[in-house]
């Protein structure tokens, strides 16, 4: 990496106030955002069972609904980071995107689950896939600047570590709370069908997570970058994209980064494989295909 590249990278991360000590109130505000960042995918994974169990979608459709939005997400994440790094506004370069992404993700999550059996499998597939892509675009707009915001809140390595520890502790509660959605959705005393439950519960999940995701945008400090020198340097859009992909190429050549990516790939795939099958194993192997008879077991294993 050249000296000029290092200088540009340093300039990009110097727009926000960097102090050694982060107040606990700021850590908690940032951590509440992490709860939303983890609750959205946690709740989505719980609700996704309904597509197969209640709406009759094939495993192929289910797989495509998982795969295609995440493919879009993988392509847009680095682009979002590039845009955020070069944003000048009175609210800083992260907070506007965190706020907008929270709104898009919350509202699209609600829309995504307004499914009806009468519409047919094909219609529900395309309807859900479309809104799912919008949802993951909203999550990209929210999560990429949000995570970057955390690394810019202090210039002290240990303080950033403490910030992330607080945030992760708060965020992990999403995976404790979300599995109970299975119990609520399939309890006949709550809803006549799981699909009806999803339509109703998604409204609460979407609105609550949207409000939680807004907290860092409102309460975490940032610096006015509206008068900052533009980072594009007068480059055209095409030149900007070329620079973006050159930067990605340089990053991918970094051996430690490759190891981290490889480990992350296997860890997340292992976890998601087990998590994806847990509900079906408990319902079909232990309870003869009756989700009502499964009771609290899916939540306890989740």
Residue ranges and their predicted role:
Residues 2-302:
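Membrane-embedded alpha-helical bundles of multi-pass transporters/translocases
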């Amino acid at each position: 990496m050249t000296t000029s590249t290092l200088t540009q990278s340093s300039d990009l991360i110097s727009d926000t106030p960097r102090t050694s000590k982060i107040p606990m109130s700021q850590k908690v505000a940032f951590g509440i955002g992490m709860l939303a960042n983890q609750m959205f995918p946690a709740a989505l994974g719980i609700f996704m069972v309904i597509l197969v169990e209640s709406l009759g979608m094939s495993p192929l459709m289910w797989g495509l609904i998982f795969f295609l939005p995440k493919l879009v997400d993988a392509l847009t994440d680095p682009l979002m980071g590039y845009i955020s790094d070069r944003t000048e506004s009175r609210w800083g370069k992260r907070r506007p995107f965190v706020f907008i992404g929270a709104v898009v993700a919350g509202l699209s999550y609600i829309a995504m689950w307004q499914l009806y059996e009468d519409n047919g499998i094909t219609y529900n597939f395309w309807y859900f896939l479309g809104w799912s892509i919008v949802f993951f675009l909203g999550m990209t707009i929210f999560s990429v600047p949000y995570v970057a915001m955390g690394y810019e809140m202090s210039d002290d390595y240990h303080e950033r570590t403490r910030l992330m520890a607080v945030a992760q502790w708060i965020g992990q509660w999403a995976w404790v709370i979300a599995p109970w959605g299975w119990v609520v959705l399939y309890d006949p005393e709550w809803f006549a069908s799981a699909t009806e439950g999803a339509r109703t519960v998604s409204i609460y999940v979407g609105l609550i997570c949207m409000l939680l995701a807004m907290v860092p945008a409102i309460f975490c400090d940032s610096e006015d970058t509206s008068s900052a020198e533009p980072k594009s340097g007068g480059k055209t859009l095409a030149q900007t994209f070329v620079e973006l992909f050159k930067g990605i190429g340089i990053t991918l050549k970094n051996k430690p980064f490759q190891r981290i990516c490889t480990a992350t790939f296997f860890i997340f795939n292992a976890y998601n494989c087990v998590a994806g099958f847990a509900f079906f194993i408990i319902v079909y192997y232990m309870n003869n295909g009756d989700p009502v008879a499964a009771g609290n077991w899916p939540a306890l294993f989740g």
